[in-house]
Amino acid sequence: MLKKIEGGVTAAIGYKASGIKAGIKKSGKLDMAVITSDVMAEAAGVFTTNLVAAAPVVVSRKVAKAGKAKAVVVNSGCANACTGEQGLIDANEMAQLTAQELGIKQEEVFVSSTGIIGVTLPMDKIASGIKQAVQALDYNG
C-alpha cells in the first residue's frame, strides 16, 4: 500500500506546482498542471510497453533516458494519442512552451496527457494554459 505524504506533490523541498483551468475540458474543471524543481532532478519514467505509444510518451521517454529533468507539464481532457505526426509536433511544442516560460531547456520537460484518444490537442488553450500555470506556480502547490 502506498503511504500518503502530507503536502502532496510539493512535499519535497524545492518543488513548485500549479493546477489551472485551461478550458480543455468542457466541464470547466482543472485540466492543466505544471510541476517544477528548483534544481536539476534525477528523472526516470515507467511507460507503456504497447507498440502504440501516445505522443507524450514518445517525448517523455527521451527525457527519462537522459535521466535529468526540471519540469513536468500535464493536461487532461485530451490524451494526444493516436494523433500521428501532429500529435508529436504538439507534444514537443508543449515541452518547448513550458521550457520557454520557465527559462529551461525543452529536453528537461516531461509531457503527460490524459483524456479522449484520437483527438489533437487544442494548442491555443494549451499555450495559454502553460502561461497561466507557470504564473501560478507555488511551493504549496
Give residue ranges: language-model regions.
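Alpha/propeptide regions of enzymes that mature by internal proteolysis
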Residues: 1-141
